Structures are given as C-alpha cells and as structure tokens.
Amino acid sequence: MSKKIKCALIGPGNIGTDLLYKLRRSPVLDPVWMVGVDPTSEGLKRARELGLKTTEQGVDGLLPHVLADGVQIAFDATSAYVHAENSRRLTELGVLVIDLTPAAIGPFCVPPVNLLALVGRRVMNVNMVTCGGQATIPMIAAISRVQPVRYGEIVATISSKSAGPGTRKNIDEFTRTTSRAIEQVGGAAKGKAIIIINPAEPPLVMRDTVHCLTETEPDQAKITASIHAMIKEVQKYVPGYKLVNGPVFDDKRVSVFLEVEGLGDFLPKYSGNLDIMTAAAARTAEMFAEEILAGRINLQPMATVA
C-alpha cells in the first residue's frame, strides 16, 4: 500500500519527537507537520532536518495549511490545558485528533482493549489515557473479562529523567484520568491510580503494579491465561512490555507486576512510560488510517456533522 495518510504533530517535546520517529517507519502514516510555540525548540529543529514543515505559531500556524497539505490526522502532545481548543479547531476541518494529554474530551483508547470498537464508532477525537493507563489497563481488562472486578488500583513508577515538564504539570490530571479509564475501559467498578517519580540514578525502567479485587473467588487458571494472552497483544506494539511477576493470588486480590522498556527510538530505553504512549498512539492512528485508505471511513468536518 503506497498511499499514506498525512499527519501533523503538535508539541515537539519528548513525546512528540519520539512519536515522529515511530511515524516515519509506518507503512500508512506520513508525518508532514511539526507544531510548536518556541522558535528555539530542539524538537522543531530536528523535525525540520527530517524534512517536515514546522511552525512556532502553535495550532494557529498549522490551520491555514491543513486542507492544502491534506492533513487528516493530528497528534496533540501538548498539555491538558490547551488540548480542548486545539481539538475543536482541528476537528472543525475534518482532522481526526489523537490526544496524548490527559484532557480526555474524547473516548479513552487502550489499543488491545477497545481500539476496534472505537474505529467502528468513527469518533473524531480519541484520548490515549496516560502512560500508566496504557501499561496497566490491559491487565485490569484481562482480569475483568474473566470475572467482575470491584476495585482496580495501579501504581506507576517512572524515572525522574523521563518525566518532562508536561508530565509534572499534569500529575493531578494523570491520577483522575487514569482512575476513570480503569473503570470505563478496564472494567473495574472503582479505580484508583498513583504515580511515583523516582529520582534514582542510574534511571530505572518504568515499573507498574496492578492490584484487583474480584467480586468472587478468582478463577486462577482462567485469569492467568487471560493475562498471558493480553501481554502478547501489548507486545505487538511495545516489545519491551514484560510480566515480571504474577499473577499473584491472595484471597480475592489479584496482583500483577510489570516493567516497560522503551524501544530507544529517540528517548532512552528507561523511558518506557513515554514509549508506550507513543507506540499506542501510532498503533491507534494506523488502524484509523487503514480504514480511511480502504474507504470505510470518510472523515467529515465537525462543523458539517453537527
């Protein structure tokens, strides 16, 4: 398939730049614009060197070129505070927005759990939850598809060096958004999320702990099989996703211990927390792109849809 869907990246920081490297390998996505607000940004400079068009005028600098350059998908890797306005202006032009901030104005997307359903719904904005959500919600979903989960709790530990200013600014949103997604996507009746930023040197890879309380006695064999099947699904786009220990059963509590090592595209391998976000976003966009190229989805400007 030689035709590709043109994409814009908003936010030339750690996540935006790593995502750019992944999109350049994609058989169906073609990154053509990088959008920032700081003319001295390293990310903008790097994107220019790779042949992308760039603007330091924010989304204002991109909008006049969207239709002329055929941009159909935009990735927003800025912050929760500006995402709603970015999304509104882009979807009005018929651009599908993949949200890598915790803004969560569109439905949550965790690829191995609900991506197929979202593609079928033809939404114009999907939210990639958070790094902790992408790492842990597949495990909660793997348990809840076997039997009801009344409580799901996750603890995501990331290295201080992999937590940029955007991550630090959005910590409250991280906990709220991840907790909601544990319930809405993971299937737990109640969800809770905790993030720990670890200053250890040398930096440690992302580690995640998942605890679930089931309504009834856990079916150990079925839950174990379900978790191992889900691990394989996540590894299709995040090869460094590993089950370190578990599932461990203690009465009605099921615990799973994970680590996530990045591919090392642009970010160091210990930044698995950022890598799982960019890999999930790229996977999501690829599935939408395949549907657009096959003629099964025709993106419409939101102004005309309303």
From Swiss-Prot:
Highest taxon above the source species: Bacteria
Record-listed NAD(+) binding positions: 162-170, 273
A molecular function GO annotation: acetaldehyde dehydrogenase (acetylating) activity
Catalytic activity from the UniProt record: acetaldehyde + NAD(+) + CoA = acetyl-CoA + NADH + H(+)
Keyword terms, alphabetized: Aromatic hydrocarbons catabolism, NAD, Oxidoreductase
Key word Oxidoreductase present: yes
InterPro entries, alphabetized: Acetaldehyde_dehydrogenase, Acetylaldehyde_DH_C, NAD(P)-bd_dom_sf, Semialdehyde_DH_NAD-bd
EC id: 1.2.1.10
Active site: residue positions: 131
Pfam families to which the protein is assigned, alphabetical: AcetDehyd-dimer
Leader sequence segment: none
Gene Ontology terms describing biological process: catabolic process
Family named by the database record: Belongs to the acetaldehyde dehydrogenase family.
Protein name, UniProt field: Acetaldehyde dehydrogenase
